[in-house]
Amino acid sequence: MQTQARPPVPQGPRFNHPATPQQVRRPINAPLPGQTAQIQGNRGPQPPKKKKRYADKLIQPKVRELVPESQAYMDLLAFEQKLDSTITRKKIDVQEALKRPQKIKKRLRIYISHTFIAGKEPEKEGDDASVPMWELRVEGRLLDDMQHPTVGANPRPAPKRKFSSFFKSLVIELDKDIYGPDNHLVEWHRTPQTNETDGFQVKRPGDRPVKCTILLLLDYQPMKFKLHPRLAKVLGIAAETRPRIIEALWQYIKTHKLQDPQDRDTINNDLFLEQCFGVSKMRFMEIPQRLHQLLQQPDPLVLNHIIQRPDDGQDKTSACYDIDVELEDPVKQQMANFVHNQTNANDIQLLDQKIFDLVDQINEMKLRRDFFLRFSNEPSGFIKKWVVSQNSDLKTLTESSGDGESDRYATTYSTTDTDEGVSRYMYQKIQQKRAELEQSLGIRNN
């Protein structure tokens, strides 16, 4: 046979089944070389690039049969999918945990000390005399900061909290008999413009022993409330945040089955709750309002101290007290960083795009291989099928699709499928209009 066949174009054909002529048909978007310029000139704007999916990373089973080593890639792909799902699930768990307040308890050591400054007599005329004075200092720090000092191995240590940041207010009450009713109180209250400090200092003239009372009100975040003694005894908590108090009350109601069996929104108070709220029944929505009357500001810390000279019978001039304070869990910041970490997102996208491109190249190579394999097995028959396919594609590219003359007549569309589709459509419309009419007339169809 002397017929010379033109070799296939580099792109190679796209096909579906090995036994049909369509398997060697050139795709519509790959015209003959002579027609490329004409087709591209008639194209409109390019559609947006299709987003790749996980399925686009998969290698076809026929490729895996030809290359058994590709199974290792599929195993890595399955492991990556499992790892991604695990990370996503953990991020969701972390996000839920971040919504809840996370506090840790630490011990704050408060130091109270005083010193005396002796007065000076004028050495000669014209010199100013100074009266004796005392200075009271209230300081403090966390015990963890003292036991675990910052070492050089940590380049960015966590910032230490100032002593004043733990309190909402501080009041020092001095002896009223000595300093009078107008000068015996020293107060500090937190404001939005407050600058935090590591301690407080108070200076006053005098060298006599002075009794002072230090009142410290802790700054709870979120705010805590002190419960009425009766309610505190019932719930077993003395001071807590409002949501925790409501939760504890609800648990008490559920445990003692105080919900009305007929009206679940009604609470039948037992003897103890009736003594607290003053009613035998109450609506569930009334609980926050009634509970507000039983909540008070927490009591301040009261520290008593005597300012006097050591030689007046006192061996020490300082005292320390340990109290428990609540701090934000440092792990919470690490959890937030984990959720919002996008450091490697761009690198992962670039690597995914490389994988997509490589898989596309592998699939394209598989098409070319099948093309040339069929050509080598049966050259003459393959060329005939390929020419027929190219001829069909050429007609599709150069002629308008469809038969315009036959499309003008109704007999073209008169088929059993068309009749059934029209009947179903009309029946559906009739039922829809009937339902609208019955609804407007108030007729209920049983």
Swiss-Prot record:
It is found in: Nucleus. Residues 220-297 form the SWIB/MDM2 domain. Broadly expressed in all cell types. GO terms for cellular component: nucleus; SWI/SNF complex. InterPro entries: SWIB_domain, SWIB_MDM2_dom_sf, SWIB_MDM2_domain. SUPFAM superfamilies: SWIB/MDM2 domain. GO terms for biological process: chromatin remodeling; determination of adult lifespan; negative regulation of transcription by RNA polymerase II; positive regulation of DNA-templated transcription; positive regulation of double-strand break repair; positive regulation of transcription by RNA polymerase II; regulation of G1/S transition of mitotic cell cycle; regulation of mitotic metaphase/anaphase transition. Its main location: nucleus. Keywords: Chromatin regulator, Nucleus, Transcription, Transcription regulation. Disruption phenotype: RNAi-mediated knockdown at the L1 larval stage reduces brood size. RNAi-mediated knockdown reduces expression of tph-1, which encodes a component of the serotonin synthesis pathway. RNAi-mediated knockdown reduces the level of bed-3 and col-124 mRNAs and increases the level of lin-29 mRNA. Simultaneous knockouts of swsn-2.2 do not survive beyond the L2 larval stage. Simultaneous RNAi-mediated knockdown of swsn-2.2 at the L1 larval stage causes sterility, while at the L3 larval stage, causes embryonic lethality for the progeny. Pfam families: SWIB. PROSITE patterns: SWIB_MDM2. Residues 1-53 are annotated as: Disordered. GO terms for molecular function: DNA-binding transcription factor binding; RNA polymerase II-specific DNA-binding transcription factor binding; transcription coactivator activity; transcription coregulator activity; transcription corepressor activity. Belongs to the SMARCD family. Involved in transcriptional activation and repression of select genes by chromatin remodeling (alteration of DNA-nucleosome topology). Component of SWI/SNF chromatin remodeling complexes that carry out key enzymatic activities, changing chromatin structure by altering DNA-histone contacts within a nucleosome in an ATP-dependent manner. Required for the blmp-1-mediated transcriptional activation or repression of several hypodermal genes such as bed-3. Involved in regulating differentiation, migration and axon pathfinding of specific serotonergic neurons (HSNs). PANTHER family: SWI/SNF-RELATED MATRIX-ASSOCIATED ACTIN-DEPENDENT REGULATOR OF CHROMATIN SUBFAMILY D. Component of the multiprotein chromatin-remodeling complexes SWI/SNF: SWI/SNF-A (BAF), SWI/SNF-B (PBAF) and related complexes. The canonical complex contains a catalytic subunit swsn-4, core subunits swsn-1 and swsn-5, and accessory subunits swsn-3, swsn-6, phf-10, dpff-1, swsn-9 and either ham-3/swsn-2.1 or swsn-2.2. May interact with blmp-1. This is SWI/SNF chromatin-remodeling accessory subunit 1. It comes from Caenorhabditis elegans. The gene is ham-3.
